[in-house]
Structures are given as C-alpha cells and as structure tokens.
Amino acid sequence: MAERVAVFVDAGYLFAQGSAAISGSKKARVDISLNAQAVIDELKSTAQQCAAGLSLLRIYWYDGAIGGSRLTAEQALLAHLDDVKIRLGFVNSSGQQKGVDSLIVTDLIELARQKSICDAVLVSGDEDVRVGVQIAQNYGVRVHLVGITPSRGTQSLQLLQEADTTTEWKKE
C-alpha cells in the first residue's frame, strides 16, 4: 500500500458550515468569497496533522457545476492550483448540489482498492459517504473526518462513528 494520503472535500459542506461558523448563519454561495490558496494550504496542513509523515497524493475538490460542466471562476482557480483535482456533480433547479456524494464514495473506494493511499482525510458531514468510508476501511485505509465548528451538529452521527479519527476546524 502506498504511503500517501488523499484529501476529499465536499465543497457544499465546506461553504455552508464555513459561512455559518464565520457569520453565525449559512450564506448563499454568491455571497461568499473563498481564499482558495489559504483553504488548500489549510487542507494540506490538516492532512499532515492527521497522517503525519505521509506524502500527499492530491486534494479532491467536489462541487456542483451550474449548467453542465462549466467551471465557475472560483472552481477554475482551484483547478489550476497544484495538487488539486476538481470533480463536479451538478446543481439542480433548486440550487442544491447533487451527485457529489457518489463521486466521493467512488473515488475513495477506488483509491483504496488500488492501494493508492493508506489514509484519507474527509471534509464532509453527509451520511451518504459513510458506505465509502466503510469499504475504504475494509481495504485498510484509515479515514480522518474533518468537521467545521460546531461539527457535532452538522455531521452525521453514523459518519462520525465510522471515522478512525475526527478533527474540528475552529472559526479562525
């Protein structure tokens, strides 16, 4: 098994919970500005804390595409950063991100099955990714779940119970 860690980021969770942590309530995506490099640097730092000594395979950034596969300016910026791979679901007519959980599950399982990683850092709260966590663990991958304060109210209890470790990002 490769001595590498991969990071899996549900952008919908990151934006919703990040905006709530900073401003006290969830904000619409159009009202949020992301310092992409700072977030990627923090994700890399978190990966090193969770999986000390392992090299980073890459950061997988899962987000919804509006109107098909067009990248937003923010997504395009992220896609050009080193060590980042954008994976797109879609945004439905109600503005909800869809198809992202299945992409996370598929990538997590495939990287585990191929023995491409030994650790995974997951930034999500959705119970739908729990099956991917379970299967990756069956292949020997340790899964580190990262939440955004107050994560205990914003992450599935079953997902928290499945993770090997849990970490909470604070407001700062």
Describe every region a protein language model picked out.
Residues 1-100, 142:
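Domain-level signal for Mg2+-assisted phosphodiester chemistry and nucleotide/NA-binding surfaces
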Residues 70-172:
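Nuclease catalytic cores that cleave nucleic-acid phosphodiester bonds
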